[in-house]
Amino acid sequence: MRSLASLALLPLLTAATIPSTPDLGKAEGRCRSNEPGPAFIVSVAGLRDRTGQFKLEVYPATAADFLADDNVLVAAGKTFRRVEVPVPASGPTELCVRVPRAGRYGVVVLHDRNRDRRFNWRVDGIGFAGNPRLGLSQPDVAEASAVAGSGRTSITIAMNYLRGMRMRPLATD
């Protein structure tokens, strides 16, 4: 009986050690033409350059779940959405991500300049909804979240890059 209990817990114990799955949340996050449901239209401002790709992710707006492992969130039935698109060579930089319902969500955009699918603070840019001031640690979810309405909600996220000893927008001195 004890071994059965151990086997039942195995998926929960291993979920925290499984590396991020790059395709999790993509199907749920992809916007479709003329779709009326709730979504964020994210304008990305302050790019260092037009290389690499954007990775836009949506998390529950709770301290415990914000920036948590995507496998753990999905296994627990919590909101996780992801959109990955190449950075356009020119023109506006807008991304669309669907959310399950109107409400508050943590939103983050990674400018993955070398396309390695992970955040390298020395190379890549990062931005959050609400555009909180960043140091070298993640912001509080209350400062890095936005409210999605019942339709498409527009937000602007300013990218931050390593400048001196902290992450900050390029336009700020």
What are these regions (language model features)?
Residues 55-59, 108:
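Beta-strand signatures of extracellular beta-sandwich domains
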Residues 6-15:
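Bacterial N-terminal signal peptides
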Residues 93, 100-109:
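A short tyrosine-centered beta-strand micro-motif
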Residues 40-46, 56:
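A short, amphipathic beta-strand motif
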Residues 69-99:
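Tryptophan-paired
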Residues 21-32, 139-165:
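Extracellular beta-sheet/turn segments enriched in Thr/Pro/Gly and aliphatic residues
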Residues 112-121:
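Acidic, glycine-anchored loop motifs typical of Ca2+
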Residues 32-42:
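Contiguous beta-strand segments within globular domains
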